[in-house]
Amino acid sequence: METFKKAMNESAWVRWSVLILVGFILSVNYYFYDAFSTLNDLLKAEFDFTNTDYGLFVSFYSIPNTFLLMAVFGGMILDKFGIRRTGFGFVFFMAFCALLSAYGASSYYGAGGFGHAFMNGFWPSYSPELKMMLLGRFFFGLGAETSIVVVCKILVKWFKGKDLALAFGLKVGFGRLGTFAALRISPALADEGVHLTTAIWFAAVLVLSGLLAFMVYMLLDAKLDKQTGFSQKASSSASEFSFKDFVSIISNRAYIYIALLCVTFYSAVFPFMAYAPDFFADKFGLSAVESGNITSWLPLGTMLFTPLFGFLIDRYGRSATAMIFGALTLVAVHLIFAFTTLTPIIPL
């Protein structure tokens, strides 16, 4: 029987088990983020949300990471305090704030539960339900994005020099699995509004289970550090933040080009995902369940093809060519949606 005389990250089955564990954390993160995209019309009916309200709710996720640079500061905190402490703190924050958003949509809160009177006392143009959900969404985004950075560092720690691009491709696949599940399960649980809060609470409890999964990972991480003689204190000292290093990174032209590519690429994907079920329902007359099912084909394709491209890039390179191909394909898809009446299954 195999023993752990060698470091745990040298064992293939342990590495892939770690990937599955942290991939689950990523999946529930994406599940909660996308669970509301198929509930847009139901939120309007239940809480009198407008399209502007829904857009505000979706956008609040990004505020702490865009305007407060929390993803950047989260990376600094990660370098300073390490995977276990940083990861637990931000995943806990993510789980708590997912529950806070669900609480804002609950009938107990709507009937005057804790915090309702306070939320009703300001910003009168928005409902107390929306304000509580915005609060949860804001802080969920703060925790969720840094937790993604933590997952990336975990994969580097376990897969460096061992199929790292494939591991990152599978990481993306796990995230899209969460999106796929949300688009399929959320409208079914909501049952045309009969059980809207059930769908939201289910998403929040999944995020809570992600916190439990991270606690399990912490045990494996501590054991690996013990085997390799890794010292968090020494690591944090070596990773001490330097403003000079920060300036060096943001003035690096290659980094700037990659960052701009990510911004433009994701701005064409994630806003579309948030509104796609509503778009398909309006343009093609589909129900919430049908439009959610069709939208779910997009993350399904990502789950299948991202690991494949990761494997090919590991073996043959050509990452720039793959990026250009992906960008051109995305342009073609949006043009088809905008100017044709083809069934949405084809471009997706």
Where are the predicted features?
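Extracytoplasmic gate region of multi-pass secondary transporters
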Residues: F36-N40, N252-T306
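Cytoplasmic membrane-interface "Motif A"-like loop-to-helix N-cap segments
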Residues: D79-V91, D314-A327
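C-terminal ends and interior cores of transmembrane alpha-helices
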Residues: F92-Y126, L328-L342
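Cytoplasmic helix-loop-helix junction between adjacent transmembrane helices
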Residues: L130-M132, G136-G175
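Flexible cytoplasmic inter-helical loops of multi-pass small-molecule transporters
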Residues: M218-K244
